[in-house]
Amino acid sequence: MRTKHLLLLLFLIAFGTSAVAQEQDLSPWTDNPHGNEWIDYSKKYVRVGITQDGIYKIPLATLRSRLGNDLTGNNVQAWFRGKQIALQIDGDNVVFYGRKNDGVSDGLMFRPGPQARLDYTTSFFSEEGAHFFTIAKDSDPILRISSLSAVPASDGPATESFHIETVVKNNSAWLTAGANANRRVGIPFAHRAEFSIQSLNNSFYQRHNAFIKLLETDQVWDETIDLKDFVTGTGENVTLKFSIHGDGPGERNVEVFMAPEESQLTEIDKRFLSSNLSGLSAISDSRTVVPGTNITEAGKGFLRFRSTTTPNNSLTFRNRFGVSYYTVSFPQSLSFSEQSSKKYYFKAKGTGKSKLRITSISSGDKVYDISDKNSPVLLTGTLSGGNLDLEVNRVADKPLVLQVVSSSGITEPAAGVFYDVKFDLLYSFKTGDKIDNVKPEPADYDYLVITHNATGAKQVREGAVEFAKYRATPDGGEYNPLVISTRSIYDQFNYGEPSPVAIGRFVNYMIQSGIKTTHNVLLVGHGVGRIDNIIKEIPSDVPTFGDPGSDVLLVSGLSNDPASNIDVPSVPIGRISAFTNQQVLNYLAKVEEYERQTREESASNLSWRKKVLNLIGNKTSDEPQSFNTFVTSAENQIPTSTGPWDVSRVSNEAKLPPVGNFEREPAPIESYMNDGLGMLTYYGHGDYSGTIYNIGYASERFQQTSKRYPLVYITGCGVGDVYSSHSGLFVASDWIIAQDKGAIAMYANTFLAYTNTAAAYMKLLYAQIFQKTDATRRTVGGIQVNMARIFTGSSSNARVSATDQEIANVHQTSLFGDPALRILLTSDVPLPVSYIDFSGSVLDNANIQLQWETATEKDNDHFIVERSFDGKTFEMIGKVPSKGPSDLGGNRYNFLDASPKAGINYYRLKQVDKAASGGQAFGYSNIISVDFKVRSQNTLISVFPNPGSDKVLITSDRGDIIKSWKLYNSIGAVVSKGQETTVDISNLSSGIFILEVVTSNDIVTRKKIIKER
């Protein structure tokens, strides 16, 4: 836990995919919301992984052995990222243009959007581009590589003598040997957070996140530049592009030099950049390289990156920085000398033709126009004396890209990159067994179990299936479960590319028919988020989102969620972080026992569930007073009306220096655990190895012969970080998977927990748990969803705007255990209509949308929606018929109030039973309030140009007079203000700003402005 208090205003920005870096084509993801639109589930597919762009061949016999004897050269098809790609049948081989995984979908994990992914040369998770081969049906269109004569005309355009070559140097190569093969262990990542120096590290990636060549303040990185076949006098610039990243919270002045001679690397006229790089920021820039000044006329020179910041003794690590990549683009001659495969890039121009001469080429070499990578064209020209002359039609404003290959350059993929695709479900409640090659129907399932593909001792699939089978039984709640592997998810919903993004796309697909109150996602298996410890292709993980790990962000902001919010999980999600089947079964046995007790035991026998123990783990002598105050505030949320509750508190205050040694002092909780607790909370310090006031490993410490398992909430920094490595046992996972011991579920922080933030979260959590009855309390996963809505300010009853620490706390509070679990129940009495949630929100600045969920419905006929403007006198404004009773438990309802009044609107629901001999009975929900403020829609205020670099103009679409404006930076500080309609941003650093505009009628509008360099 960090005791530094930060009060920052955070403007919530809609993180979209509209502005992406030019190198990143996200259309397969933005055009296809789920990713499986291209699949014909009646076909067989074989996946072929390609790690380098180029021309490849596969024997038809190889494909036939996997797809069947019906495959011929006439009916073979292939797909890449949801698009059919053209093939060439060359004798007994299929020839195609193959592509590596460029990591473009990693951009979907960056904020404020994919444009923040500065190092576009690196994929975080994979190298393999997935190419799917299949047999076409008779009616299917077939794409083939066409041949085109490109013989030059005698009166054509002048011959072009060069293309633009780009040399790429990055610092993210996967290790190839040793114990860490296929990882990036030891390769610095900006920023891999350390508790000692980092005040905040978001789980989503940001501009500063990249693998780097790490430099201390007294170090330099020198590179030798040698531009092969450099052509001068073309009129085209040589361009250096680079990205520099801060790796600590300090300040540093970074410099970039380029010179013909190494001895000139300190000369001012050779310096491209001298700029302050503050904290965890990044500089992505380009410079024109001048032959004779920065390189020789032959294209040779030296490149240097350095910092001029004076080292500060032992704190030099605070000023660290690094270079993620650099590229040099330059005019290069059209020579194929000593090449087996070569790409030639010609810049975009208007319509017309390009006449080219490629030298040092032989008769067996082939030239493909790959400008459209999905549909290459085989070109033929005039070959004479080792020179190939071509005249190629140009597409207006599009680059021309050619791939030249020799016969040896057309390679056959290794056998290990082929595998037979199975769009399978490891389990479906519909059959009670596995189903191969099936399209999961969203309306059929609500309990989604995701596990990985590891085999042997590390496989946990059998345990995952057993868990799903239990949830399908009456005792388990009669859910409609499926079990699916990450491999199947990658293939169906992410074009075969491993990524955490795939899980969100799968869940988004599964909720397209509507989110049910019974929807849950259970991750079964370990997952690593620490970026330098991820295994290439993620073969044996159920991945988490980002680093620090966040399971919440896997399912947040899904487009099929009507209440979509990027910081709020669309459905409840939990994880069993197990390494073996037995560990999964250990937890299943605890869940079965916990729910058996609810069904079969008396309220008196379940009275232990009314016991709460609050542990306090202090670290310094000034903390007990404030920590006790925070815990008292949370305890005050426990009412007597839902009790009686038996609340105890234990602190390590007496063990603090100078009296004793607080480090890892065992917390005296054995008797509490053995007798039974409903909930155990730890408020205090911790790290990934445990809590300061040590609760220890449940598997080693407790007897718990009574099999009474508590819900556990831990605020200690990093105690929930089970995502850092593939080995070892973590406290958070041990308490879940320990046999007959530990917790029934746990909320725990995966990174930093700040005192104020943790205290506020704990207070709200206690309200969500203890102020609810057995009938109205949500599942542990549902509670987490509610907490996210309230804590981030995205529900009608929410707090004021959240700080970045508070939002990070939501992301980095993981739920370990089954999200469908209902806790603290002391009876199994059939429930009347009970509400899980009742909330309202302003919609389109004109309406108020009401939403409510019922946990159960019995003999319910309809709801009457009532509104009040004083909170006392209510009137009927609508009637909503019941959807129940539902086999799925409860239902979700919506109602639109199209005529709210400005100010506070109060609402309640009148639930009316079906008619009986004594007339219709009814009951009321709680009362909620929605503040309806008349505000303009963002579309009424326009800002142009945006992005911009100099001045931007404010206009009102309906002619309102601009009264005043303020411009805020990303931390809420005012950087400029005025009353005119022009905003000068020329002197501001590049980044994202919020413009707040007030018009003459006092309507306030906020617009996001992007400042470019």
Regions found by a protein language model. Name each.
Residues 1-25, 747, 798-800, 946:
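Bacterial Sec-dependent N-terminal signal peptides
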Residues 21, 326, 367, 471, ...:
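Terminal processing/anchoring signals of secreted or surface-associated proteins
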Residues 22-828:
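Cysteine-dependent hydrolase recognition
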Residues 439, 832-857, 925-958, 967-973, ...:
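Surface-exposed, proline-anchored Ser/Thr-rich loop/turn motifs
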